[in-house]
């Protein structure tokens, strides 16, 4: 099946395990967001590289702010509920999961390591030495942060950029990696919460990388695409082109800023504004009829009428500013020209009209990115 979740899960990087009772292979992933905690269990599908979901659990997230654990007890309860529900629906017992990690402390850097060839052909030992030096460079660049993932970007030998340098001749061999860093404190706290919920952390996958693997085809990764994952309190962006990561960034703002704008403009609570946004939100001014009103009733209170024109204008103005910031971010990072397509995902991408707002402000093709399991690569571990 092809399923669109409230948040995109890191399916390509989840862990292969054996069901204790039936001896079947299955996969488990855990995504702990500010708004929701989701746990997915899947099994290899009939087609090579595809997966079939056999169980899912979700819970309202508590104890997490901007992707970071702030209350261990509440976070553990949310994780435990999602994991137990996933185990029940899948009829399996999980011992470990791959966990997506993000938050405002996630950072990235492009790093290079090299080795001198002295005119000789590139050997396997040269490749390993260049890769080792690239890893050391990434650790130095992190300045004390934990390296979450190193993504190989290829090799350069002389004027040639390649994925397979063995046998080439040149003065030196350079290995390029894209490093993603996270807060060691947050990673440790997240691990403890997951363990207290009853499962082990097999490994972490950065949210931006996981989202890109889940929503982009191989063609899109080659031609150039930016994935903007709009969470509740954070937004991540990753640019892939020529099959490589060009840029990654996480900002401490998300879909909640739209909610806060509505609350301030309409003079209502954040809870009421969130409900109003979910039920009647829209970013396209063309969808407003003159004099149209929205009838809103919250928790049994007397219904109230709000101007739909004011509601839509508020959300449209925020969307315009939001995507203007990301356009400028990509320009400043010299990544804008690599992008042919923008893919929106995460809970914030469900706001009606947001894709049109992004296209108008960024000047790129835009689509909403549900997971398509047909192009995912199953893990080998």
Give names to the regions the model predicted.
Residues 328-341, 345-346, 368:
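Hydrophobic alpha-helical bundle architecture
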Residues 223-265:
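Glycine-rich phosphate-binding loop of actin/hexokinase-like ATP-binding domains
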Residues 35, 281-284, 338-361:
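Glycine-rich phosphate-binding loops at beta-strand->alpha-helix junctions
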Residues 3-36, 40-226, 244-246, 255, ...:
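Nucleotide/phosphate-binding catalytic cleft detector across ATP-hydrolyzing
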Residues 318-327:
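A general structural motif
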Residues 374-380:
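Conserved small/polar residues in nucleotide/adenosyl-binding loops
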Residues 39, 99, 194, 229, ...:
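Residue-level signature of catalytic and energy-coupling elements of molecular machines
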Residues 197, 361-362:
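Short, structured coil segments at secondary-structure junctions
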């Amino acid at each position: 099946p092809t399923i669109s979740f409230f948040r995109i899960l890191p399916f390509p990087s989840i862990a292969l395990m054996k069901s204790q009772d039936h001896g079947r292979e299955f996969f488990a992933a855990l995504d702990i967001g500010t708004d929701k905690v989701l746990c997915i269990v899947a099994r290899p599908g009939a087609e090579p590289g595809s997966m079939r979901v056999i169980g899912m659990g979700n819970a309202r997230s508590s104890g997490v702010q901007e992707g970071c654990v702030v209350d261990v007890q509440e976070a553990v309860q949310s994780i435990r509920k999602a994991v137990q529900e996933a185990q029940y629906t899948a009829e399996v017992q999980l011992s470990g999961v791959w966990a997506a990690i993000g938050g405002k402390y996630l950072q990235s850097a492009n790093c290079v390591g090299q080795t001198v060839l002295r005119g000789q052909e590139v050997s396997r030992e040269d490749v390993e030495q260049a890769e080792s030096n690239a890893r050391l460079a990434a650790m130095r660049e992190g300045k004390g942060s934990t390296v979450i993932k190193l993504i190989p970007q290829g090799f350069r030998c002389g004027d040639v950029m390649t994925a397979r340098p063995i046998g080439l001749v040149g003065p030196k061999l350079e290995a390029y990696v894209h490093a993603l860093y996270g807060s060691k404190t947050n990673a440790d706290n997240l691990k403890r919460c997951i363990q207290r919920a009853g499962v082990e952390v097999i490994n972490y996958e950065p949210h931006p990388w996981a989202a890109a693997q889940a929503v982009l085809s191989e063609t899109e990764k080659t031609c150039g695409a930016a994935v903007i994952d709009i969470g509740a309190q954070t937004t991540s962006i990753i640019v892939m082109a020529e099959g490589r990561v060009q840029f990654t960034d996480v900002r401490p703002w998300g879909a909640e800023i739209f909610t806060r704008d509505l609350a301030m403009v309409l003079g209502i609570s954040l809870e009421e504004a969130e409900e109003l946004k979910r039920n009647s939100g829209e970013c396209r001014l063309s969808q407003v009829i003159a004099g149209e009103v929205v009838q809103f009733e919250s928790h049994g209170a007397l219904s109230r009428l709000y101007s739909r024109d004011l509601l839509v204008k508020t959300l449209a103005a925020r969307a315009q500013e939001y995507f203007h910031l990301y356009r400028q971010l990509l320009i400043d990072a010299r990544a804008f020209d690599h992008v042919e397509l923008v893919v929106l995902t995460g809970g914030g991408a469900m706001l009606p009209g947001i894709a049109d707002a992004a296209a108008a402000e960024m000047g790129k093709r835009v689509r909403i990115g549900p997971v398509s399991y047909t192009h995912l690569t199953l893990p080998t571990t």
